[in-house]
Each structure stands twice: as C-alpha cells, then as structure tokens.
C-alpha cells in the first residue's frame, strides 16, 4: 500500500498530499533524553535537563556502600567465630592428616639406626610415617627420615635365544633408602619398637637395624656367669636335633637298620 503512491510520484501522477504523507514517514525521530530526573512535581521537566550524571550515580551506589558497612560491622562484632574452626573428626583420625608428633632427646645418645629400603617411594614414605608415629607413642625420640643415596643396578642380557641372541636389552633397578634414628632409647623399648614394626610390616619394605646397648664395665665376667645358665637351657634343646629321639648308642644302630629294612620291604 505504501509502495504504490511512491511509484506514482516518480511517474508524476500522484498528488502532493500523498508525497507529503510519504515524506513524513521517513522523518528522523526526536533526540532521546540521556539524563534522568529524580525530582517529582510540576518543575520536573525543567530540572531534568540540568540534572548531572554524577548526582545520579551517587544515589544509585549508596545502597552498596551501606551493605559493605553492615558487613564490616558484623565481621568486627564477631571476630572469634570466623577464626575458630571446629573439626568434627576424632583426634586419632585427624592425626593422619597432620605431621607425626616427636619426642625431644635429652642427651642425644644414639641407640638405634633403622634403615628402610624399597623400590616404591609411595610405600617407603607411608611406612616411615608409620614408624615415626609408633616411636612417639612408645616414648622414643625419633629423628628422620633422612634420604640416603640411591642404589642403582643395571643388567644387560640377551633378548632371546637362537637367531635373536645378538639383540640385547637393559634392565635397571633403583633402590630407595631412608634412615630413622632413635636417641636416648631404652634397649627393651627399642626392641619392642622393632618387633612392632616387624609384626605390622608393609609389603615391599626391607628393614635393617643397628642397635647399640650400653652396659657397665666388666662385661666378660657377666658373660662367664651367664654361660652356665645358657648351657642348662640348651640341654633340653640338643635332643631335638635328631629326627629319632630314642636312639641311645652305636650298638643298637645295626638292629635299627635291620628292622627298618624289614619294615620297608614289607617283611620279605
């Protein structure tokens, strides 16, 4: 409907009224007002053009400042509730996530050196942590674990036999080591600690312990006195060294062999 008067005007047939109405459609829109007015009343339209933008921004940002002030006042009023964090786990379970506790050595005299070896770093660190916790609960001052130099072993072997014997392959094995030292420990407590680690040994872990015991002067006399006690204990053990306990002398040995031959052959 709008295109037809425009085409007629181009041909000189359309009246002027239609031209004016068509031109009024394409007139530009009035300029929009960019400043908003906050006041209300009959003079609002006159003041709207003079209202600055900065004044509007301050009025809109005022609630944000009030919220920040309220949050700061609430944080200042209750500082202790935010700092204190209560754990719901038992202490025995929470201790697994913390470093193992340690005892302090009074004199610093070494009593045991425990060396742990493994091919897996994960198993080694786990068992070192277990050994340190066990030493703490036994009252032993433990130090470590100290990383020792690695032991690297390599082998070159034929890959196969027959026609493939010229092709070779290399193998490498790395042994990781850690050292835990016990100071100022009682010999019986150290033996109890080592026995506990042997009882609850972890797979893939090798242990080697060097234990020092301090005794009084005149150790040879104490060893001579204990010799007689050891002999009495061994008298009952010597009987178990032979598989036949009732064999008394050499004279009955021939009779014993004859009876065994008859028994094995079935009386033939």
Curated annotation (Swiss-Prot):
Keywords: Mitochondrion, Ribonucleoprotein, Ribosomal protein, Transit peptide. GO terms for molecular function: structural constituent of ribosome. Pfam families: Ribosomal_S10. Disulfide bonds: none annotated. Its main location: mitochondrion. SMART domains: Ribosomal_S10. It comes from the Eukaryota. It is found in: Mitochondrion. One of its GO terms (biological process) is translation. Residues 1-64 form a transit peptide. One of its GO terms (cellular component) is mitochondrion. Component of the mitochondrial ribosome (mitoribosome), a dedicated translation machinery responsible for the synthesis of mitochondrial genome-encoded proteins, including at least some of the essential transmembrane subunits of the mitochondrial respiratory chain. The mitoribosomes are attached to the mitochondrial inner membrane and translation products are cotranslationally integrated into the membrane. Belongs to the universal ribosomal protein uS10 family. Component of the mitochondrial small ribosomal subunit (mt-SSU). Mature N.crassa 74S mitochondrial ribosomes consist of a small (37S) and a large (54S) subunit. The 37S small subunit contains a 16S ribosomal RNA (16S mt-rRNA) and 32 different proteins. The 54S large subunit contains a 23S rRNA (23S mt-rRNA) and 42 different proteins. This is Small ribosomal subunit protein uS10m.
């Amino acid at each position: 409907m709008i295109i037809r008067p425009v085409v007629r005007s181009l041909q000189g047939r359309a009246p002027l009224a239609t031209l004016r109405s068509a031109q009024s459609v394409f007139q530009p829109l009035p300029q929009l007002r960019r400043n908003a007015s906050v006041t209300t009343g009959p003079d609002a339209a006159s003041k709207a053009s003079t209202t600055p933008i900065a004044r509007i921004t301050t009025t809109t940002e005022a609630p944000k400042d009030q919220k920040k002030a309220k949050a700061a006042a609430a944080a200042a009023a209750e500082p202790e509730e935010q700092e204190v964090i209560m754990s719901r786990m038992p202490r025995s379970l929470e201790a697994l996530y913390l470093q193992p506790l340690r005892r302090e050595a009074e004199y610093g005299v070494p009593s045991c050196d425990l060396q742990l070896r493994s091919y897996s770093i994960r198993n080694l660190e786990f068992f070192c942590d277990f050994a340190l916790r066990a030493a703490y609960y036994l009252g032993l001052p433990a130090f470590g674990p100290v990383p020792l130099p690695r032991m690297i072993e390599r082998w070159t072997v034929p890959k196969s036999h027959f026609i493939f014997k010229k092709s070779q392959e290399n193998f490498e094995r790395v042994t990781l080591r850690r050292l835990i030292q016990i100071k100022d420990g009682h010999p019986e407590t150290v033996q109890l600690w080592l026995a506990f680690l042997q009882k609850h040994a972890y797979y893939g872990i090798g242990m080697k312990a060097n234990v020092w015991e301090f005794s009084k002067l005149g150790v040879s006399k104490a060893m001579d006195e204990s010799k007689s006690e050891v002999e009495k204990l061994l008298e009952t053990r010597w009987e178990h060294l032979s598989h036949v306990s009732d064999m008394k002398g050499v004279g009955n040995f021939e009779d014993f062999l004859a009876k065994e031959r008859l028994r094995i052959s079935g009386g033939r």
